[in-house]
């Protein structure tokens, strides 16, 4: 049980930002990552569709890889599916919204926080509710940025056009008094440098990856599930879409070749 992998799922490549942080904080753990790049983005999809897709990814990992913990490294899927999946499976399941909210609360000085995310994440008010539950005196600015996920998935995030698309997407927040900005989509940290340049050094840019990895570590430790094996960890990367495109983005993000990327098909009927 201890050597069973942690499953990390996302609509595409964005959850790699969370997986990378889990690998850094928990270097002995085996990680299996599934990016549903064929059906990305989840942001504009109907909620029932997002729920079904998230369950398909979850069931695939439970049945084929016997994961000991699941990380829903997608804000849209967290907002829509986390509660349902937590109630239904027999392993620990964490999302990325609560950790992101906690991280922002720690660093804001003026209690004015911005949140950017997909249409579904923003529409759900999940971040605003999480933030106000922690501090009801906060002022929260929400902004949907639907252009950013397709841009990251295209693999062009190292291009100079990143600054232009960030400016186009974030300009409504530019003249606000926010001192902290939550990247409410796990794709967005890949554009963190461009976002920081546009918003200015006075704005704290919050990615949920670090806090999510810390929560994973805490839960595994509490439940006695930390991997103690001296054997080097085995990390697997799976995608439902174009394997070469996924591998290129993963290699760029990790700064080295991640190894073999497997293309999978999710044809099994939903099981809940």
Curated annotation (Swiss-Prot):
One of its GO terms (molecular function) is glutamate racemase activity. InterPro entries: Asp/Glu/hydantoin_racemase, Asp/Glu_race, Asp/Glu_racemase_AS_1, Asp/Glu_racemase_AS_2, Glu_race. Pfam families: Asp_Glu_race. Keywords: Cell shape, Cell wall biogenesis/degradation, Isomerase, Peptidoglycan synthesis. Substrate binds at residues 10-11, 42-43, 75-76, 186-187. SUPFAM superfamilies: Aspartate/glutamate racemase. It catalyses: L-glutamate = D-glutamate. The keyword Amino-acid biosynthesis does not apply. Transmembrane segments: none annotated. Provides the (R)-glutamate required for cell wall biosynthesis. This is Glutamate racemase 1. It comes from Bacillus subtilis (strain 168). The gene is racE.
């Amino acid at each position: 049980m201890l050597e069973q992998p942690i499953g990390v799922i996302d609509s595409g490549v964005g959850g790699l930002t969370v997986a990378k942080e889990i690998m850094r904080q928990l270097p002995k753990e085996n990680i299996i990552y599934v990016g549903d790049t064929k059906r990305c983005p989840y942001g504009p999809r109907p909620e029932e569709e997002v729920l079904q897709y998230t369950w398909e990814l979850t069931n695939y990992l439970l049945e084929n890889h016997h994961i000991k913990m699941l990380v829903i490294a997608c804000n849209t899927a967290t907002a829509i599916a986390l509660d349902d999946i937590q109630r239904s499976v027999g392993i620990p399941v964490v999302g990325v919204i609560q950790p992101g909210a906690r991280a922002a609360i720690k660093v804001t000085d003026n209690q004015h926080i911005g949140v950017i995310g997909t249409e579904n994440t923003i529409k759900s008010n999940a971040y605003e509710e999480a933030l106000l539950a922690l501090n009801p005196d906060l002022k929260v600015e929400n902004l949907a940025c639907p252009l950013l996920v397709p841009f990251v998935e295209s693999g062009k995030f190292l291009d100079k056009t990143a600054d232009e698309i960030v400016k186009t997407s974030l300009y409504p927040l530019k003249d606000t008094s926010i001192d902290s900005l939550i990247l409410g989509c796990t794709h967005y940290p890949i554009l963190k440098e461009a976002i920081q340049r546009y918003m200015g050094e006075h704005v704290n840019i919050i990615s949920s990856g670090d806090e999510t990895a810390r929560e994973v570590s805490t839960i595994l430790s509490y439940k006695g599930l930390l991997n103690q094996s001296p054997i080097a960890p085995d990390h697997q990367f799976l995608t439902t879409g174009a394997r070469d495109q996924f591998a290129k983005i993963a290699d760029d993000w990790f700064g080295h070749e991640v190894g073999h990327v497997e293309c999978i098909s999710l044809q099994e009927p939903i099981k809940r």
